[in-house]
């Protein structure tokens, strides 16, 4: 169970007879899912959103499947209490390790980022590189999704354990980050890839660094763009698209609200008001302690 400093129940004020006005839930381990939120603002400007960052337990990319399932169920239980109409797993690790299991356990649609990203990649190239967290790379989720679409495509995957901590520490411009990125990209460049997939929603935040290191002909796929396109289609199919003006986005985290707010302003263009949700018994990660 959880407790929240102020987010409880249906604070959006919609009725059960107005499911279209219910919010979309978006979650990630940290700020990476803000790349998906930005796409929702662009593609679905009428939708209200609740964003959750599980910052007390990041990074997800080094966790086991059992841990990820526990975390995801905690978040989805909380989202259910917020009366969301849909949830977007704005986290590739969760999409790889938990999506197929938990989507059978809840009565609202849950979308992941991997399949939309894989479909977009196959449309662009035949020699595809995927950079992701170690857990996503180990799962082979992108390779499997791509090969289900086109088994003739070649796929190379690289796990990038240092990227999420560097991004969460706002070290995008640090020369060390460039050197780390160079080391991760080098084996893919040697394979002469024609397409690179951001296999973690944090990675678009590194776009200037990654683009500067890649050959100019390499196309970049940001699954955040394509999962929101899938959201649009799903909402239309279910008759859940909102035609009313949206309510302000609500932000909540399991870790330090102030730290998330400070990080989020750079990517959102405004300072988000962030509230704390305490999942009982959650140990704060060492990274979150370092950031505090």
Curated annotation (Swiss-Prot):
Pathway: Cell wall biogenesis; peptidoglycan biosynthesis. Keywords: Cell shape, Cell wall biogenesis/degradation, Isomerase, Peptidoglycan synthesis. GO terms for biological process: cell wall organization; peptidoglycan biosynthetic process; regulation of cell shape. It holds the Pfam family Asp_Glu_race. It catalyses: L-glutamate = D-glutamate. One of its GO terms (molecular function) is glutamate racemase activity. The keyword NAD does not apply. It comes from the Bacteria. The active site is at 91 (proton donor/acceptor), 200 (proton donor/acceptor). Its EC number is 5.1.1.3. The keyword Cell wall biogenesis/degradation applies. Belongs to the aspartate/glutamate racemases family. Provides the (R)-glutamate required for cell wall biosynthesis. This is Glutamate racemase. It comes from Nostoc sp. (strain PCC 7120 / SAG 25.82 / UTEX 2576).
């Amino acid at each position: 169970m959880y407790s929240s400093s102020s987010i409880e129940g249906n604070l959006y004020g919609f009725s059960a007879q107005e499911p279209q006005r219910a919010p979309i839930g978006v979650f990630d381990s940290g700020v990476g899912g803000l790349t998906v939120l930005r796409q929702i603002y662009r593609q679905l400007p009428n939708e209200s959103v609740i964003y959750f960052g599980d910052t007390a337990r990041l990074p997800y990319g080094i966790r086991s499947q059992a841990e990820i399932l526990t975390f995801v169920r905690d978040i989805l239980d909380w989202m259910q209490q917020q009366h969301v109409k849909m949830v977007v797993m704005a986290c590739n690790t969760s999409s790889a390790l938990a999506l197929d299991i938990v989507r059978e356990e809840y009565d609202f649609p849950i979308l992941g980022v991997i399949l939309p990203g894989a479909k977009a990649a196959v449309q662009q190239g035949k020699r595809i590189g995927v950079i992701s967290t170690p857990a996503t790379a180990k799962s082979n989720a992108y390779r499997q999704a791509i090969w289900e679409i086109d088994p003739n495509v070649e796929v190379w995957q690289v796990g990038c354990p240092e990227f999420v901590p560097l991004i969460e520490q706002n070290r995008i411009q640090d020369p060390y980050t460039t050197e780390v990125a160079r080391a991760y990209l080098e084996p893919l460049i040697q394979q002469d890839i024609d397409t690179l997939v951001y296999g973690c929603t944090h990675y678009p935040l590194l776009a200037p660094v990654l683009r500067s290191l890649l050959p100019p002909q390499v196309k970049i796929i940001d699954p955040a763009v394509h999962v929101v396109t899938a959201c649009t289609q799903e909402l239309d199919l279910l008759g859940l698209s909102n035609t009313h003006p949206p309510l302000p986005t609500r932000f909540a985290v399991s870790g330090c609200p102030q730290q998330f707010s400070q990080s989020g302003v750079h990517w959102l263009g405004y300072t988000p008001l962030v509230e704390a949700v305490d999942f009982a018994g959650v140990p704060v990660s060492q990274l979150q302690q370092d950031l505090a």
